[in-house]
Amino acid sequence: MDPCKVNELRAFVKMCKQDPSVLHTEEMRFLREWVESMGGKVPPATQKAKSEENTKEEKPDSKKVEEDLKADEPSTEESDLEIDKEGVIEPDTDAPQEMGDENVEITEEMMDQANDKKVAAIEVLNDGELQKAIDLFTDAIKLNPRLAILYAKRASVFVKLQKPNAAIQDCDRAIEINPDSAQPYKWRGKAHRLLGHWEEAAHDLAFACKLDYDEDASAMLKEVQPRAQKIAEHWRKYERKHEEREIKERIERVKKAQEEQERAQREEEARRQSGAHYGPFPGGFPGGMPGNFPGGMPGMGGDMPGMAGMPGLNEILSDPEALAAMQDPEVMVAFQDVAQNPANMSKYQSNPKVMNLISKLSAKFGGQA
């Protein structure tokens, strides 16, 4: 595998650990399904991701966008993280080294031959012949690909050749075979140090010393640890500031939701009051309905002080169309207008909803005084 791709994958995994919501995007569905199919469990999305998923997008205000961008900019103290990069090199991009066939059936003869190759590799290594040592360790690995120390030894040579990615690949394989061996952690820590991966280097070197104390590993740990701690502190400050901003945003969202709820309640209350005011003739039209409606409500003379006691009212209220019209604010406004000034009837001659109700009332009460 291309070492650059491996580094990109490592960075992606680190990002997922810091923010699991990355895995809950639609683009990452295939990865979630694969992890779950292998028996793994995808961490739940962060609260922020859930809230963003459940919130409809609104057209942003340009001023607010500018303020948000400024708020998202880390302070100079946090953004200007200066780390001494002395000794850091560019990553190696050679083709992956031969790793052997882990499924091969190993005989005693092959194990003996692998051991001979290892001894020969150590001898040429002591003579400074690094590439020849790599070749001999590779031969030993192909003969016995399930011996962790062979990968660790070859990794040590890759570190000396300043090929940290190749060394990391060997150490990863050695740790898979024997996770209790200190050597792979030591050399992987040194490889990470060459790449400027201070946190990873500190972790591996510390773990190597924990498994089997080594002065060389301890000395390098003392070198990288302050840088790793500085980075960790930087991220703590950033995350703390990020969390504070999230809390403020959450408070603002709650406040806005409360205001929206209160506004909706006020509007609902206003609608109820409006409905009560223009409801089905409570207490009659103000001032009654003097005289006859112009334009034809025959026999509907006199005032209408109230409809509660009017004969036939229950029948009218049981008529769905009439009841719906009485609950229509537009119709009831028209009735109030006509009640105050019957001459205004002419304004509603072309309104079928108003005239339909008038026709029903005229038919029902036309002959009653």
From Swiss-Prot:
<feature type="compositionally biased region" description="Acidic residues">
    <location>
        <begin position="89"/>
        <end position="98"/>
    </location>
</feature>
<dbReference type="InterPro" id="IPR006636">
    <property type="entry name" value="STI1_HS-bd"/>
</dbReference>
<protein>
    <recommendedName>
        <fullName>Putative protein FAM10A5</fullName>
    </recommendedName>
</protein>
<keyword id="KW-0963">Cytoplasm</keyword>
<dbReference type="Pfam" id="PF17830">
    <property type="entry name" value="STI1-HOP_DP"/>
</dbReference>
<comment type="similarity">
    <text>Belongs to the FAM10 family.</text>
</comment>
<feature type="repeat" description="TPR 2">
    <location>
        <begin position="149"/>
        <end position="181"/>
    </location>
</feature>
<feature type="domain" description="STI1">
    <location>
        <begin position="319"/>
        <end position="358"/>
    </location>
</feature>
<dbReference type="GO" id="GO:0046983">
    <property type="term" value="F:protein dimerization activity"/>
</dbReference>
<feature type="compositionally biased region" description="Gly residues">
    <location>
        <begin position="281"/>
        <end position="300"/>
    </location>
</feature>
<keyword id="KW-0677">Repeat</keyword>
<feature type="compositionally biased region" description="Basic and acidic residues">
    <location>
        <begin position="49"/>
        <end position="73"/>
    </location>
</feature>
<dbReference type="InterPro" id="IPR034649">
    <property type="entry name" value="Hip_N"/>
</dbReference>
<feature type="modified residue" description="Phosphoserine">
    <location>
        <position position="346"/>
    </location>
</feature>
<dbReference type="InterPro" id="IPR011990">
    <property type="entry name" value="TPR-like_helical_dom_sf"/>
</dbReference>
<keyword id="KW-0802">TPR repeat</keyword>
<dbReference type="Pfam" id="PF18253">
    <property type="entry name" value="HipN"/>
</dbReference>
<dbReference type="InterPro" id="IPR019734">
    <property type="entry name" value="TPR_rpt"/>
</dbReference>
<feature type="repeat" description="TPR 3">
    <location>
        <begin position="183"/>
        <end position="215"/>
    </location>
</feature>
<keyword id="KW-0007">Acetylation</keyword>
<keyword id="KW-0597">Phosphoprotein</keyword>
<feature type="modified residue" description="N6-acetyllysine">
    <location>
        <position position="360"/>
    </location>
</feature>
<feature type="repeat" description="TPR 1">
    <location>
        <begin position="114"/>
        <end position="147"/>
    </location>
</feature>
<feature type="region of interest" description="Disordered">
    <location>
        <begin position="256"/>
        <end position="300"/>
    </location>
</feature>
<feature type="modified residue" description="N6-acetyllysine">
    <location>
        <position position="353"/>
    </location>
</feature>
<dbReference type="InterPro" id="IPR041243">
    <property type="entry name" value="STI1/HOP_DP"/>
</dbReference>
<feature type="compositionally biased region" description="Basic and acidic residues">
    <location>
        <begin position="256"/>
        <end position="272"/>
    </location>
</feature>
<dbReference type="GO" id="GO:0005737">
    <property type="term" value="C:cytoplasm"/>
</dbReference>
<feature type="region of interest" description="Disordered">
    <location>
        <begin position="38"/>
        <end position="98"/>
    </location>
</feature>
